[in-house]
């Protein structure tokens, strides 16, 4: 199975979700000056920001990570967290990244996620990678 890459703000909601998920993952640094580069296909797990609009929905650190052509070429899907209080904009970062990178928006969960979200993502990630061609 390939990896997960995620970003979590100082609220640590996405980080807590990833810890509970228990799958191999790399964290995009909170400090914008620190950079990471991935070397295998990945699913991106990202929180949504901005309170409703498209502008500002994707964290700056994630934009910088995806602006690296090497990193962007390896993304295979996106999972987004958000807050249902934002209505239609709930999980908007997933929609934005899916459209801009041409990858499927696989799942969304609220804040730290529920046990059901953890179970769904574990199962969904496993099934997703099983469906992918081996040389992708």
UniProtKB/Swiss-Prot annotation:
Gene Ontology BP, a term: protein modification process
Pfam families in alphabetical order: Flavodoxin_NdrI
Coiled coil: none
GO molecular function, one term: FMN binding
NCBIfam families assigned to the protein according to its UniProt record, in alphabetical order: nrdI (TIGR00333)
Protein task: Probably involved in ribonucleotide reductase function.
Stated family: Belongs to the NrdI family.
Protein name: Protein NrdI
Species of origin: Citrobacter koseri (strain ATCC BAA-895 / CDC 4225-83 / SGSC4696)
Encoding gene (name): nrdI
